[in-house]
A protein has these predicted regions:
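Short functional hotspots at interaction and active-site rims
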Residues: 1-217
Length: 217
């Protein structure tokens, strides 16, 4: 059972209450789908994945750094606000992940991402947890047959473990750096994503509360 006390022990903010966790209905949905597909033999398994997008810009991400005593570090910067975006989805338990570098955050790119995730796991049914961005609820969103969307409560990014993956990517590839071109941003993003070790991802996204959701009430 997920108790109010256990939520405090897990360092979850007080505003993230047990009611908000239960509103996700992840546990009941996951087990209902798993049972149904096992009986129907229509999908191999149900994958629970957390989805989000992040923007990466040519401007330097200023952060603290080491420097010789008595000297002030100099960091290159500029004012070119050109972005590339990255869509991502990750399983918080197995750390299986999927990423798509995109030209924007909108319905068109979300449709492209959903199609590619669907094609990456054609024999599985994917329960995709995401935030309430307007393009996630567009009337023209095309949801593949093997994907189902569920949404975290508004203003609760801490309930989406993939948020920590973006922090790790920025720390590895975008801290105190300026990029001459958008192509350089894309290259660095690809390099960092491909270099993310499974053990690092596991420690980054693993949350005890995500496991508690599946314990018996």
């Amino acid at each position: 059972m997920v108790s109010e006390r256990s939520l405090l022990d897990l360092n979850i903010p007080r505003r993230q209450t047990l009611r908000q966790l239960r509103r996700l209905k992840i546990k009941s949905t996951f087990y209902t789908l798993s049972k149904r597909f096992k009986e129907e033999e229509s999908y191999n398994k149900v994958r629970l994945m957390y989805q989000d997008e992040a923007g990466f810009v040519r401007i330097s991400k200023m952060s603290s750094c080491w420097a010789p005593k008595g000297s002030r570090p100099s960091i290159h910067s500029h004012y070119m606000r050109e972005y590339r975006y990255c869509y991502g989805a990750i399983n918080a338990h197995t750390v299986d992940s999927f990423f798509l570098i995109a030209g924007g955050c909108n319905t068109e790119w979300t449709n492209a991402f959903l199609r590619q995730v669907s094609q990456a796991y054609p024999d599985d049914y994917i329960l995709l947890v995401m935030d309430n961005a307007i393009w996630h609820k567009s009337s023209t969103l095309e949801i593949p047959n093997n994907i189902e969307l569920t949404f975290i409560p508004p203003y609760t990014p801490e309930m989406n473990p993939i948020e920590q993956v973006w922090k790790e990517i920025r720390k590895r590839g975008f801290k105190n750096k300026a990029f001459q071109t958008l192509e350089a941003v894309i290259d660095k993003l690809q390099e960092v994503i491909l270099g993310l070790e499974k053990n690092v991802l596991k420690s980054t996204v693993s949350r005890q509360w995500t496991r508690l959701l599946f314990e018996n009430n």
